[in-house]
């Protein structure tokens, strides 16, 4: 772990393709002394699984697009400039109603390690080609290792898993 100053320009970070998402790790635990992870997300329309983080709280700042967020029993719609706070141990899901650009902060750091293990280095700074299949066994195993509880996969993932 490090607790030294660091800075990235707008092109800096570690870009990853994870299913249909381009995520760029802007700050990881090894750069922030474990305090937080910050990722830049670019997504097509779609949704995350219904899941619970047991190790970190999660915040999202929406830069572009429309998102519907369910956290516990509440559902809200978000537009650019909105901030969503998802506390640990509460089930939640994001539905990206359009292509979206968001910043994700995880406190403490560690969630970025899960994303890096699930994804692959992005050869280009653009959304991955459509049709990336989810390896559900790897996903569930890594999720459990990183304190994530998967309650329900998105329907398109469930259909892929049955093939």
Model segments located where?
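A short, N-terminal "cap"/entry segment at the start of jelly-roll beta-barrel domains
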Residues: 1-35, 127-163
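Conserved short histidine dyad/triad with adjacent acidic residue
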Residues: 22-25, 39-53
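Glycine- and acidic-residue-biased ligand/ion/polar-headgroup-sensing regions
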Residues: 55-67, 72
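A cytosolic small-molecule/anion-sensing beta-strand core signal
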Residues: 63-64, 79-80, 98
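A contiguous, mid-protein "functional segment" used to position or interact
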Residues: 99-146
């Amino acid at each position: 772990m490090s607790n030294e100053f660091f800075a990235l320009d707008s092109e800096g970070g570690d870009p990853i393709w994870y299913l249909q998402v381009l995520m760029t790790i802007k700050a990881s635990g090894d750069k922030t002394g474990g305090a937080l992870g910050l990722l830049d997300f670019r997504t097509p329309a779609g949704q995350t699984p219904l899941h619970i983080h047991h190790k970190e709280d999660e915040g999202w700042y929406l830069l572009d697009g429309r998102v519907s967020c369910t956290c516990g029993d509440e559902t809200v719609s978000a537009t650019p400039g909105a901030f969503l706070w998802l506390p640990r141990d509460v089930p939640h899901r994001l539905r990206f109603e359009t292509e979206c650009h968001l910043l994700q902060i995880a406190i403490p750091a560690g969630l970025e390690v899960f994303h890096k293990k699930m994804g692959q280095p992005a050869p280009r700074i653009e959304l991955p080609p459509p049709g990336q299949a989810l390896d559900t066994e790897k996903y569930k195993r890594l999720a459990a290792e990183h304190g994530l509880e998967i309650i329900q996969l998105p329907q398109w993932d469930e259909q892929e898993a049955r093939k």
